[in-house]
Regions:
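Flexible "cap/lid" subdomain of the alpha/beta-hydrolase fold that forms the substrate-access gate
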Residues: 2-19, 24-27, 31, 39, ...
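The serine-hydrolase catalytic nucleophile loop
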Residues: 37-49
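A short, Lys/Arg-enriched amphipathic alpha-helix followed by its capping loop at the start of a domain
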Residues: 47-56, 92
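Recognition helices and adjacent regulatory flanks at domain boundaries
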Residues: 44, 63-66
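N-terminal cap/lid subdomain of alpha/beta-hydrolase-fold enzymes
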Residues: 50, 61-64
């Protein structure tokens, strides 16, 4: 049983991409799918996965362009396409039905999957993710216009600092009552992947 609790670091070929995922727990246990968000990867769940593995069969993927999954240049980086890559991974691994934990980008990705396969969803935990356009408050209007309505290098420029060290660090520390409890490994890992050629463009896409 102890071996089943160890986190496995695996890859699967999906649509010609090497898709990385973390997996732990007894395959006979209830399944729990962890879908994270910007700017991280399954690395954000590195402590949660082993804490759940004694009760759940846990899986968490890196999306294309994130973490250890391939980042092809010729790829449609949309929530719909990302959801279909994750869906194909779940089919390949037989990982369904499941409980779904989704955070940030995990919301529009996970909700698309369960909309296509409602029988796969047993329960869900929602943390800071959005299901509807109405969930975007007026504070998002400038970003939505810059990227979705009138996208140019000029409209992108004010958003680029969010992909630099201080911006990525802010994702983890903003509003936290004790930032010294947050390991810098988090944003340093994200920055490692963001510094790949073309990675910032992928995130803006």
């Amino acid at each position: 049983m102890s071996d089943l609790l160890d986190v496995q670091h695996r890859t699967a070929e999906i649509e010609g991409l090497s898709v990385f995922y973390r997996e732990a727990g007894d395959p006979e246990s209830p399944k729990m799918l962890l879908l994270g968000g910007f700017p991280a990867s399954s690395h954000q769940f590195r402590n949660l996965i082993p804490a759940l593995a004694d009760r759940f069969h846990v899986l968490s993927p890196d999306y294309p362009g994130f973490g250890n999954t391939d980042m092809p240049e010729d790829f449609e980086y949309t929530f719909d396409h990302l959801s279909r890559i994750v869906e194909s991974l779940l089919v390949r691994t037989g990982f369904h039905p499941f409980g779904l934990y989704h955070q940030d980008y995990g919301g529009p990705i996970g909700n698309r999957i369960v909309a296509r396969h409602p029988d796969w969803l047993e329960w869900q935990v929602i943390q800071n993710s959005n299901a509807y356009d109405e969930g975007f408050t007026a504070a998002w209007d400038g970003i939505r216009h810059a990227l979705w309505v009138d996208r140019t290098p000029e409209t992108e420029a004010p958003l680029l600092p969010f992909l630099e060290r201080d911006g990525v660090k802010l994702v983890y520390t903003h509003g936290h009552r004790d930032p010294e409890r947050i390991s810098p490994d988090n944003w340093n890992m994200d920055l490692h992947f963001l510094e790949r050629p073309g990675a910032r463009k992928v995130q803006l896409d």
